[in-house]
Amino acid sequence: MTLAQFGGLFVVYLIGTLFVLTLTYQEFRRVRFNFNVFFSLLYLLTFYFGFPLTCLLVFQFDVEVVPVEFLLYAILSATAFYAIYYVSYKTRLRKRSVQPRKAVFSMNRVETHLTWILLALVAIVTVGIFFLQNGFLLFKLNSYSQIFSSDVSGVALKRFFYFFIPAMLVVYFLKQDLRAWFFFLAATVAFGILTYVIVGGTRANIIIAFSLFLFIGIVRGWISLWMLVAAGVFGIVGMFWLALKRYSLDVSGPEAFYTFLYLTRDTFSPWENLALLLQNYDKIDFQGLAPIVRDFYVFIPSWLWPGRPDTVLNTANYFTWEVLDNHSGLAISPTLIGSLVVMGGALFIPVGAVLVGMIIKWFDWLYEMGKSESNRYKAAILQGFCFGAVFNIIVLAREGVDSFVSRVVFFCLIFGVCLLMAKLLYWLFDTAGLIKARVQRSRTLTPPASSVRADGLL
């Protein structure tokens, strides 16, 4: 990359960044937080944050990168995608209804507590089983790629670990005070560190827990935008340190700075992967919707499907194995736009942008319903579900549509099963006569009738 090429690329990058950043900031000032703001920040991080890091690697360390023309295509496609997404998100297909909707379900105190307990048990039990089978992998494996080898058993259990976070979210939304906020941080980060050590370097739970803590603080007004930026810098440094431990790296001086640049870029902003995919566009045999179906294979136990393929050819694996001919053991993320290109080429980019706009709009609709819900227990469940889906939106932006669809369906299924089990347990307790009236104490000798609620569990 020459300085002239860098100058032209920088102008295009600056226009795209300012475009996305301006729309995001306007939305932030209007609502402080919704899922459009979250997705937009995540989108900026994924497709724009890595450009300065790439330039530093090129000019400071003479690192070879994708040809400039494909870097340009990556920036242009990212900006065009966001423009279409934003129009899709803001377009209202029907008039706003002024009549209240009929409630689909209701929640009481016991059902809500049973729900978060079941969600937490799903995570804790699966972590325990994984530990009994493998021990502390962080101290046993020589390289991170060994996590995906046949030597590690029960890999599918890792998908259940995340449910500890929505469980703690429900606990927080029942109280919504500073004490509950810090309890959420302490509990989820501690659990994330535990899974980091057991699984052998997986940082997802720590990143998500810290991110949710910050966004809850933004929503409640407990932290400012500048505090969020400072916390983001702290988070980047923390993730770099964890990455050094995960890959057993011991670096110092210029090598440490070089390692920081490429690890931070690959962790938070794999935008060069999109440029690399576009460079190999002629090698792609468009997969259609098959990667979405294939990504569900990992959720099917081998005892239920004896002939299940050992390898899943989703868009990430197709990009890694078929396009790049890379068989190192790690899948290279194609990003959201890259997954659309693998499935249907450039024509799938605007179609995907429209669909993503509708998906984010649905999450915002559900989130607003939770905020306006008068039943505090139902509100906690709805908001816990929405914030719990943050991981799936991260997967959408970073890994692609196919991974998002399979994970969001899995998340909804497990969350729904726990909710139904909680209602079933409540019905059984009530039938057995274990549910008694919960009488709230009052300073007066005769408490008012409203202080009696039939939702206590002895």
Curated annotation (Swiss-Prot):
Single GO BP term: enterobacterial common antigen biosynthetic process
InterPro entries: WzyE
Keywords (A to Z) from UniProt: Cell inner membrane, Cell membrane, Membrane, Transmembrane, Transmembrane helix
Entry keyword Kinase: no
HAMAP family (UniProt xref): WzyE
Function: Probably involved in the polymerization of enterobacterial common antigen (ECA) trisaccharide repeat units.
NCBIfam families: PRK02975.1
Protein name: Probable ECA polymerase
Source lineage: Bacteria, Pseudomonadati, Pseudomonadota, Gammaproteobacteria, Enterobacterales
Encoding gene (name): wzyE
